[in-house]
Each structure stands twice: as C-alpha cells, then as structure tokens.
Amino acid sequence: MEELYQRFIASAGICTDTRKIVPNSIYFALKGASFDGNAFAAEALNKGATLAVIDNPAYQIDERTLLVPNVLLALQELANYHRRTLKTLIIGITGSNGKTTTKELIKSVLSEAMQVVATEGNLNNAIGVPLTL
C-alpha cells in the first residue's frame, strides 16, 4: 500500500471513468453491473493516466498496470491509508433516512468557520467516500 500511496501523492488524483481522465491521474478499473473497468485500462493509460489499477491479469499491459486482488478494496484501502495521515476532524453520519440532507446542513454550517470537504450529492457509499478522501 505504501508504494501505491506514494504514487497517489505524486499524481493529479484518482479517476474511475476514462471519459474524465486527466494527465498524471491514477485509473481504478472498477466493475459495474454492465461494464468491466479492466477493459478500459489501456484507454486510460493512452489518455494520460500514469497508472491503471486492475484486478484481471488479462488486461495487464506493462509496468503502468498494477494488478491487485480486488480494485474496489484497493481503492478503499488507499483511502483509509490516506485518511490516517490527515490531522483533521471527521464526522460520520448514519441512519436509514436523511443522511444526505444532514450532511449538507453540517457542511453548510461548518464551512462558515472552516474548510470543509464532503462527498458530492449522495455519493455516501463504498465508492464515493474513498473518492472524496
């Protein structure tokens, strides 16, 4: 994880969508119900990503692809590793209803006095939270 973290620190950020690749970013090949992000690893690298994190060896191209057992888990572990380096207050919100509204209200109030980072919209899930971190 340390090696991936050092590459993350030196990168322009993380991307999971090849349509939004920026130069020097790291592409995480997430899978969805109707797509396999591994299939887009070469495209991500061609568009300027410096690293593609994949979990299918069939898509391993060269040293610019990092093969991991599970891409989503690698993204979550990277976010957790990064979070542990931060010296900041973290607020978690749980419940069945109203989490996004509560998050937006807290963000609005706290941003009057301090710098605030929060997930966009309702991306309060296994992908949105790591991407926010």
What are these regions (language model features)?
Residues 74-133:
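Phosphate-binding loop of NTP-binding sites
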Residues 1-77, 81:
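N-terminal leader/targeting and accessory segments in enzymes
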